[in-house]
Amino acid sequence: MSRAPDRIAACFDALRHSGRKALIPFITAGDPSLEATVPVMHALVRAGANIIELGVPFSDPMADGPTIQRSSERALGRGAGLAYVIEAVQEFRREDATTPVVLMGYLNPIEIHGTRRFAETAVAAGIDGVLLVDLPPEEADETRAIFTEVGLALIALASPTTGEARLDMLCSTAQGYLYYVSFSGVTGAADRLDTHAASDRLRQLRARAGAPVVAGFGIKDAASAAAMAVDADGVVVGSALVAALADASDVRSARERAEDFLQPLRQALDAG
């Protein structure tokens, strides 16, 4: 089959040339409703998103805090499994052929699907990358090889506790972008970001990595996004956005909440 277009690289190239930072919102597919996922994705792009991370609902999301755990449970209760997520991206691509979409999730659903079959199906649907939070880099060679063959980026995670040997491996094999978790813990758990420590690490990573470096975990609003973006190529916002969408009463409300939440972050990043 033909390789996927490299939308992630094109996105970061365009941002670099315009002196802007990537804004990467995370939402759980299927929450606040099955019908809202694609309209919310389009709303986020209108509000200034450059890349969308779409969470694949999973029954045991060990890296996620209570906000995303509850979101995942609600989505699973509506039947939002891997097949639904792939179909949602297919629908999104009917109107948006350029915004990169990255799936974030766990290894088990992909292994059940079959890694090669999943990779081919994902690329055909218009998915650009996958971040598997429970796939150790030391065990990722086979998955990366399959993904690389079809043009699907295997996005890697680094954290403040990542050892130097593993960090060397992550930097040398980084695809799409390297996701730096700005503190140790589960998503949504940080009350206060240590931006100074994170900035030092981000500068080191950007000097070493063969891909852009984005920061996430603990970014809740425009101020924290702007602070973290100074030494990163972009920022990811997840739990705070998921919480803002959680009790949207209908698709229109979900769209409006998505735009209202993201626009101040876009403005703050562009002002910086």
From Swiss-Prot:
The active site is at E53, D64. InterPro entries: Aldolase_TIM, RibuloseP-bd_barrel, Trp_synthase_alpha_AS, Trp_synthase_suA. One of its GO terms (cellular component) is cytosol. It catalyses: (1S,2R)-1-C-(indol-3-yl)glycerol 3-phosphate + L-serine = D-glyceraldehyde 3-phosphate + L-tryptophan + H2O. Its EC number is 4.2.1.20. It comes from the Bacteria. SUPFAM superfamilies: Ribulose-phoshate binding barrel (SSF51366). It is an enzyme of class 4 (lyase). Keywords: Amino-acid biosynthesis, Aromatic amino acid biosynthesis, Lyase, Tryptophan biosynthesis. GO terms for molecular function: tryptophan synthase activity. Pathway: Amino-acid biosynthesis; L-tryptophan biosynthesis; L-tryptophan from chorismate: step 5/5. Pfam families: Trp_syntA. The alpha subunit is responsible for the aldol cleavage of indoleglycerol phosphate to indole and glyceraldehyde 3-phosphate. Tetramer of two alpha and two beta chains. Belongs to the TrpA family. NCBIfam families: trpA. HAMAP family: Trp_synth_alpha. This is Tryptophan synthase alpha chain. The lineage of its organism: Bacteria, Pseudomonadati, Pseudomonadota, Gammaproteobacteria, Lysobacterales.
